UniProtKB/Swiss-Prot annotation:
Source organism of this protein record: Homo sapiens
GO MF terms, alphabetically ordered: RNA binding; sequence-specific double-stranded DNA binding; zinc ion binding
Pfam families linked: zf-CCCH, zf-CCCH_10
Major subcellular site: nucleus
Database matches in SMART domains: ZnF_C3H1
Subunit-structure text: Interacts with ITGA3.
Gene name per UniProt: MBNL2
Gene3D superfamilies linked: 3.30.1370.210
Stated name of the protein: Muscleblind-like protein 2
Function, as annotated: Mediates pre-mRNA alternative splicing regulation. Acts either as activator or repressor of splicing on specific pre-mRNA targets. Inhibits cardiac troponin-T (TNNT2) pre-mRNA exon inclusion but induces insulin receptor (IR) pre-mRNA exon inclusion in muscle. Antagonizes the alternative splicing activity pattern of CELF proteins. RNA-binding protein that binds to 5'ACACCC-3' core sequence, termed zipcode, within the 3'UTR of ITGA3. Binds to CUG triplet repeat expansion in myotonic dystrophy muscle cells by sequestering the target RNAs.
Origin organism lineage: Eukaryota, Metazoa, Chordata, Craniata, Vertebrata
InterPro entries: Znf-CCCH_Muscleblind-like (IPR054429), Znf_CCCH (IPR000571)
């Protein structure tokens, strides 16, 4: 059966903060200039916030005394940006939920969500045979939107590198400190004023970047602390300031969604049962000053690796004891250290079993210096 995930209605993106000065009756700005809402008495205000009328945004509200706010132009622009951002988040959540349902019910056919460009399918790569443990891969889950995925590679065992298309163009769109210049204003025939046009009307043409016909916004002016006598950046009007703040809020939410999508993509890249917690390493007792025996069987590898690979890597790990200063009596080693130096154990025991000995028999007339670790 097919999975149909219905979008969840959310009215948070329609919520606006009410101007506190307006509630006290001391706000000197008009409804079109203030960046906060000035609701009439018919609107319901809860905890200093008011909900905007969705029908008013569409231009179809016919209520005489609407209990929702009919926002002015600059606040309507901010709400439209929030609405598009909320729609993207809903579709992203629906896609990730459908992906998780596919893992829970393997026989369920999964239909990709439209309007999203998806990354390429994960294919084979010859680099896996040389480095099967860790391979860099950019999370490219088929149903997760590529606009919210980070470009930083994620280390996933046994995964080939996958590139996400369109990430460079997305980074340019996420610039929140630039505004497009009104082309009609540049021609001198823009009928809208500076406070009504949704594009920038810079007073100085030197501010305009000719490569993309944009101007850089003075962020200090938006924060109310620009003290330059002649600023080289653009000082936007109130409605464009609201647009920039909404774009910054959208970029922050997109970054949070990107982290969540990357984490979900990393988890879903592993097959079920491949990730297990590492067991605690067994503590080996020390005796007579010797260090612990290093046993390769204590090492823990992931169950996804084959046993042949384990044997190849474990073959190069030496086993046995590491000696330091004082040898143990239980160690099967043919070396003993006396006050005269290092001598052959079999020579000391007067046992001759082979013609050539690798150790020099020390006589009483030769004194060798004792080496320390």
């Amino acid at each position: 059966m097919a999975l149909n995930v219905a979008p969840v209605r959310d009215t948070k993106w329609l919520t606006l903060e009410v101007c506190r000065q307006f509630q006290r009756g001391t706000c000197s700005r008009s409804d079109e200039e203030c960046k906060f809402a000035h609701p009439p008495k018919s609107c319901q205000v809860e905890n200093g916030r008011v909900i905007a009328c969705f029908d008013s945004l569409k231009g179809r509200c016919s209520r005489e005394n609407c209990k929702y706010l009919h926002p002015p132009t600059h606040l309507k622009t901010q709400l439209e940006i929030n609405g598009r951002n909320n729609l993207i988040q809903q579709k992203t959540a629906a896609a990730m939920l459908a992906q998780q349902m596919q893992f829970m019910f393997p026989g369920t056919p999964l239909h990709p969500v439209p309007t999203f460009p998806v990354g390429p399918a994960i294919g084979t790569n010859t680099a896996i045979s040389f480095a099967p443990y860790l391979a860099p891969v950019t999370p490219g889950v088929g149903l997760v939107p590529t606009e919210i995925l980070p470009t930083t590679p994620v280390i996933v065992p046994g995964s080939p590198p996958v590139t996400v298309p369109g990430s460079t163009a997305t980074q340019k769109l996420l610039r929140t400190d630039k505004l497009e210049v009104c082309r009609e204003f540049q021609r001198g025939n823009c009928a809208r004023g500076e406070t009504d046009c949704r594009f920038a009307h810079p007073a100085d043409s030197t501010m305009i970047d000719t490569s993309d016909n944009t101007v850089t916004v003075c962020m200090d002016y938006i924060k109310g602390r620009c003290m330059r006598e002649k600023c080289k950046y653009f000082h936007p009007p109130a409605h464009l300031q609201a647009k920039i703040k909404a774009a910054q809020h959208q970029a922050n939410q997109a970054a949070v969604a990107a982290q969540a999508a990357a984490a979900a993509a990393t988890v879903m890249a592993f097959p079920p049962g491949a990730l297990h917690p590492l067991p605690k390493r067994q503590a080996l007792e020390k005796s007579n000053g010797t260090s612990a025996v290093f046993n390769p069987s204590v090492l823990h590898y992931q169950q996804a690796l084959t046993s042949a690979q384990l044997q190849q890597h474990a073959a190069f790990i030496p086993t046995g004891s590491v000696l330091c200063m004082t040898p143990a009596t239980s160690i099967d080693n043919s070396e003993i250290i006396s006050r005269n130096g290092m001598e052959c154990q079999e020579s000391a025991l007067r046992i001759t079993k082979h013609c050539y000995c690798t150790y020099y028999p020390v006589s009483s007339s030769i004194e060798l210096p004792q080496t320390a670790c």
